[in-house]
Amino acid sequence: MRILFMGTPDIAAESLNALIAAGHDICAVFTRADKPVGRKQILTAPPVKQTAEANGIPVYQPRTLRDGSSDELIKSLAPDIIVVVAYGCIIPPQLLHVAKYGCINLHVSLLPKYRGSAPIQWAVLNGDAETGVTIMQLDEGVDTGDILYVQPVAIDPDMTSGELFDRVSAIGAKTLVEVLPKIKAGKLTPKKQEESLATKAPSLTKEMAQFDFTQPAAHIHNWVRGMNPWPMAFFMHDGKKIKVTASKLSENPANAAPGSVLAVKPLTIACQDGAIVLDSVTPEGGKSMAGTAWAAGRRLKAGDSL
């Protein structure tokens, strides 16, 4: 198929690579603007642009599609279908039906659950055992279009958002390649989303990453997993942020007040119910270290309180 691809980050680049490998004709790529990256703020092309340029595919980076300035260009490209994967720009109504087979989107949740920009993270934050990949027709809403295909994806108990992102990216790319021939053959029947089941997945903020030990151990563990790799879950100790990069639920009962140190090898803290092991932490202004090493540096012992 002749495809106009719209996407920006790594997950979109993986899908673009899969479509290229499958032999599809990618007539052009639309992506977001290059951005300064890292401490030195080096202007860097988004992953999709890098992939497109490596394969000799024309790249366009309009600031917006809403003003109509790209309409004639897109029409002139004459795509069979427009494929959108984490583009980051709203597709306006006048472009939804330009292509013969319309405009489809790959969304990484089991829609209508987790509409929004952070579906992977919220699935982990909420302790879900399953998420998925949904191929949907784009409409004028945010992730509200008719569903064409759903592929469930398992979430392992200790999996981080970053690890789930990698899993979903690969499955999403594979699913997209498998679904396109079915769309062309007219074998998929669009299904309306059940609005009563809709939930939102808003973007994460640094402030949202904070937890405290008066919360349930399972909630804290999910927070540590879901906020990894960004912004990283943290608790406050002596006025400093202590980020927790890895944790696990303790099998031992917590017969102590929340925040009590139950053990330092491994560093185990009592919670509202149960206890959590802090395997790896990053003190404010410091480097990542084992929870046990941090506890030793703070001269913590069983019975102390965080």
Predicted feature residues:
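An anion-binding loop in the catalytic cleft
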Residues: 213-306
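Donor/substrate-binding cores of folate-linked one-carbon enzymes
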Residues: 22, 32, 81-200, 207
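N-terminal Rossmann-like dinucleotide-binding module
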Residues: 1-39
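Acyl-group handling in specialized metabolite and lipid biosynthesis
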Residues: 202-215
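A residue-level signal for conserved active-site and pocket-lining positions in enzyme catalytic cores
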Residues: 7, 29, 52, 82, ...
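Short beta->alpha connector loops
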Residues: 8-11, 63-66, 87-90, 227, ...
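N-terminal glycine-/serine-/threonine-rich beta1-alpha1-beta2 phosphate-ribose binding loop
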Residues: 36-78
